[in-house]
């Protein structure tokens, strides 16, 4: 929704591809609006410089995105062949735009700045023979603080990440989601963050978030994320402690620490692991 004009979309394309296209008319938006894709509200596909780009937004991590990409690209290429009167049953090879699939992720679970998701990872047969079909989705984390170089070159995307972070912070402090949204939108408008967009589409943005927001699921996800981070941090501390004990040849302490939690805490404090 935020990238609802060619100028913003071209800026995003330039930021991702390190290009400097200036004419928005060079970009041909061809998002499918067929009934089959009505649920894919956050997708946009467009052609520029011989590349067929598919951009999709996801608020949860989904390893099945490459499979979605296959379905989507097959329809896009089918439309491209028809629109350009390409003869696929002749001996002459047809020329097609190169596909590029980008997934913008801003879920609450911690993910790296960039990750490649491959269709082949879904296949049951994992022998060394290369599959005849592959689709790669590049997932970019657009949560606030991630992909800072990308954000530096695309103000719209940076402001969107700030807005989402602002909404999340107010949800934690305000008594209702409605109050949180009102404050987040007012704050961003006052700080010139997506101000033009939020002024024009305030009601739509509010309604969209209220429609998709599940308070219980959101809080459960935050708790699960915190527990997972705690487990990872705890394992790192224990691994560090074990290394120190092994290096010092304190084998009896190592054995005792695996059975006695209080003694384990004492050793962690002794080695300054906190």
Describe each PLM feature range.
Residues 1-274:
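Elongated, amphipathic alpha-helical interaction scaffolds
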């Amino acid at each position: 929704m935020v990238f609802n004009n060619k100028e913003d979309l071209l800026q995003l394309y330039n930021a991702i591809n390190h290009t400097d296209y200036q004419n928005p008319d060079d970009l041909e938006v061809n998002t499918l609006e067929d009934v089959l894709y009505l649920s894919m509200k956050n997708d946009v596909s467009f052609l520029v410089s011989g590349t067929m780009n598919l951009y999709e937004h996801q608020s949860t991590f989904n390893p099945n995105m490459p499979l979605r990409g296959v379905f989507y690209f097959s329809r896009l290429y089918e439309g491209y062949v028809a629109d350009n009167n390409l003869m696929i049953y002749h001996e002459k090879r047809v020329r097609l735009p190169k596909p590029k699939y980008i997934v913008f992720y801003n879920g609450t679970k911690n993910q790296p700045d960039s990750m490649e998701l491959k269709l082949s990872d879904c296949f049951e047969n994992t022998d060394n023979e290369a599959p005849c079909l592959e689709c790669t989705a590049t997932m970019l984390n657009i949560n606030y603080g991630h992909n800072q170089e990308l954000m530096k070159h695309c103000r719209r995307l940076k402001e969107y990440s700030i807005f989402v972070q602002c909404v999340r912070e107010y949800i934690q402090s305000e008594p209702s989601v409605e109050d949180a949204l009102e404050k987040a939108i007012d704050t961003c408008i006052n700080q010139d963050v997506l101000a033009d967009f939020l002024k024009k589409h305030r009601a739509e943005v509010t309604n969209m978030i209220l429609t998709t927001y599940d308070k219980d699921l959101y809080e459960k996800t935050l708790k699960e994320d915190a527990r997972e981070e705690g487990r990872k941090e705890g394992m790192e501390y224990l691994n560090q402690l074990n290394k120190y004990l092994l290096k010092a040849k304190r084998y009896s302490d190592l054995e005792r620490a695996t059975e006695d939690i209080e003694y384990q805490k004492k050793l962690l404090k002794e080695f300054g692991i906190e």
